[in-house]
């Protein structure tokens, strides 16, 4: 047994996100249809307290179009972040979520994933943004809009 001491050190750092807008209306329609067809397969038992599909949706219509986009972008941002190291991106899971008013996602991380992403098919007026609790008093909320694809590090 090792005597392990935990120390919380004050750290000033940035949370880096990578964002781009996708203009894929036909893909979006397919994804929306599949999310509606699947309904809530997780029964609100995950961190997402809303309608959530299965975990591995990559073969479903629309999702199968999003996957190569996500893999390509993750490779590009990895080369930027990790100084041109050769990267072989892979997808562990991809799912869909549909929120109603008052439904939330509990703060969580996606460790051990290097990257996580969220893709907004639509963004109702006054919808809350994507929020990072790690930013505390600095805010940390990203305003969402239809077609916005946001990558962030999996440990946050």
Regions found by a protein language model. Give the residues of each.
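Catalytic core of non-heme Fe(II) oxygenases with the double-stranded beta-helix
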Residues: 88-156
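Non-heme Fe(II)/2-oxoglutarate
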Residues: 1-87, 104
């Amino acid at each position: 047994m090792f005597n392990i001491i935990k120390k919380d050190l004050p750290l000033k750092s940035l949370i880096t996100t990578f964002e781009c807008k996708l203009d894929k209306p036909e893909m979006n329609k397919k994804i929306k249809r599949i999310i509606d067809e699947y309904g809530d397969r997780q029964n609100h038992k995950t961190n997402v307290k809303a309608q959530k599909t299965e975990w591995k949706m990559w073969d479903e219509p629309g999702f199968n179009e999003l996957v190569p986009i996500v893999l390509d972008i993750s490779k590009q941002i990895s080369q930027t972040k990790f100084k041109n190291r050769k990267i072989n991106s892979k997808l562990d899971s991809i799912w869909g979520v549909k929120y109603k008013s008052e439904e939330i996602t509990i703060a969580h991380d996606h460790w051990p994933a290097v990257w996580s992403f969220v893709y907004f098919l639509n963004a109702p007026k006054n919808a809350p943004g994507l929020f990072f609790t790690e930013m505390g008093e600095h805010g940390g909320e990203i305003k969402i809009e239809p077609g916005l694809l946001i990558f962030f590090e999996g440990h946050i």
